[in-house]
Structure formats: C-alpha cells, structure tokens
C-alpha cells in the first residue's frame, strides 16, 4: 500500500468522513487483484502518516459508526474499548459519554447485559512497573484448545500495551519464540524482565532472554521471573477480555457441531479442518481486539499507545543480535543437551505434501467464505457460517485427495 496509495487521496477520503473499511473498498477497486489494501493496512498507513478525522462527528454519523462497530466486534465492547475501536477506524476525539449513549441506542440489550456484569473485582496484590520496557508478560490461552487454537500474547506491564499476539494450533517453544518474543525484540527492543508461568513452552524464549540480558536497560534486575499463572496480573486481565470478545463466541458455535455429531474430534482430518478454520477466524477477532485495546483510554494516563511513546525505555537491539529461530534452537540444544519439539499441526493435514492442492484448498476457502463475516456473525450469536466453513473445509480436503 505504501508504494501504490496516494497520500493526498487518502487524506481527502478521511476529510470526507470515509472510514478505513470504506477506503479499503475504494483502493481495492482502484487496484484490482493487488493485495495489501485491507482495512488494517489502511489503519496502519493512516497512523504512520498522521492522517485522521479532524472535522466534528455528528451524532448521526457516530451512531452509524457505532452500529457498524457492534456488528464487527460484538456485544462486549463498552464505551472505552468501543472508543478505542472507533479510533482504529479513524474517528478520534469522541467523548466516552457520547460513545456510551450511542452504544445504548445501537443495541439496548447488549447495553443491559454489560451493565449487569460490570461489577469490578479489586486486585488485592499491588502491581508496579516503572516504565515501558520494565516488565514484559507473556502467557498462553487455551480456551479453544480442544479445537486446535492457542493464543499467546505479550503485554508491557507499565503501559498495558499489547505488543504482540500469535495464534497457533498447539503451544510450542519454537513458534512462541518465532512469532512472539523475536518480533517483540526486533520491533521494540529488550525488556528488563520477562515474566511467564512455569510452563515448559517458554524455555527457548527464556534462554534467549538470558543470553541477551547484558543489553537491557537495567541489568541489575533478574532477567526473567516464573510465577503461578494467576499472579501474572496484566496478561490475566487481557485473557478475560479475549475470552468474552473472541474465544467464547467461537467455542459456542463449534460446540454445537460436536453436540450434533457433525464434527468428530477423534478423527485426525476433522481435527485439522476445525483447527484451520477456527484459527483464521479467531485471528480476525484478535486483530480487532488488539487494535482497540491499544487505543482505549486509561483514566488520567492516555491510551496504551500514547503511554508507550512517553515512557519507552525498552533497550534497542540490532537485528543481527537477535538469533533467528534456527540459530536459537541450535544454541539452546547445544547448551542444555535437550531437544525442542518442532512446530506441528492439530490433527492431520493429508494435503501437506502437495503444495498445489494446499494452495487450491486455500483459494477455494477464500472464494467461498469471508473470515471477517464469519467472525462478525459468530460474535453476534450466529455461528452458522463458521460451522459451514468447518464442514466445507473437511469435505474440500477429502475431495482433493
């Protein structure tokens, strides 16, 4: 998008009040067959070029955008996270009270449900982080584990900014290092302290964190701490949000397939199909949640993205100093004498040895199903499209054998 989009055109679209979704449609029409014009790409482009709405948003315009937001992210976003979501769509500077009123008008039943469950639970154990770059919390979420979906997230303890998430079939040392820790180190730098639970899936990440520990901002701190998962406070807060906004709606739809005997989780090909579709669907929800979370206002402090820019003390590290996955695995196994399990799928992909058939399956799935539509419907209580996609994936795989 950076090479093809005209910045003046994008600014003009925003000035006319077009959302990122609308701009994505326009650019896709201008450059048919060219990838890279998704709504998320447009969001990133606008953020990098400081392009956002500067004209007042009328109540009617706000109402329409909130209704679209509810359709996209479901019933659990309150005024703060919905304000964050609207910011990801280019709508800045809208008061929480206005967003709250629009939410109440857009979906009264959702508003009542949020109010009924809004009692806040106090955390009896004080939490402290000195700056962005002090504590990095990494944890896994397996609420969809029975369907071959595991989320891993990394959050900065000071700002609350989600700096990286990854979705994988099964938790795995190599995938967590490759898709979570290494991208964080390359993008932001090193944290003084990495905090994880006692799971063995973090061994490679801890090994590299320790090997790079001399390059941290504050080398007097322990480079990592392992504790009970329930005491990994910032990341545990995030999982509650993710479960409500992503995992539970997807799980509810898939549970129906199992209950109706339409999905056999003892059969390896079916396990692979449900994992493939559920992972891609949940990635849509995770992307929407992460963007909204990082733009939601924290009273008296600003958004996580803003706090990051004000107190960033993560230690920059040159890319060549961060080992590749292959280098990290070799170093770990040489130093410990252990062996790390390579990445693997949930269930059996019978087309794995045929790239042409794998590509054909992917193209057929994209042609027949839109992942954003699947997620939006599932999160609003209609899981039929997700169920159809799982069954279609299984039958399509069988037909390509």
Predicted features by range, described:
Residues 1-36:
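Double-stranded DNA-binding cores of transcription factors and transposases
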Residues 3-4, 60-64, 175:
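Amphipathic alpha-helical repeat elements characteristic of tetratricopeptide repeat
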Residues 16-18, 76, 158, 188:
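A short, glycine-centered helix-capping/turn motif at helix boundaries
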Residues 18, 40-135, 143, 226-228:
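Basic, flexible linker segments flanking DNA-binding modules
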Residues 29-31, 69-70, 84-92, 168, ...:
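Conserved short loop/turn motifs at secondary-structure junctions
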Residues 91-110, 122-300, 365, 370-401:
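RNase H-like DDE/DDD metal-dependent nuclease/strand-transfer catalytic core used by mobile genetic elements
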Residues 300-401:
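Protein C-terminal end segments and domain termini
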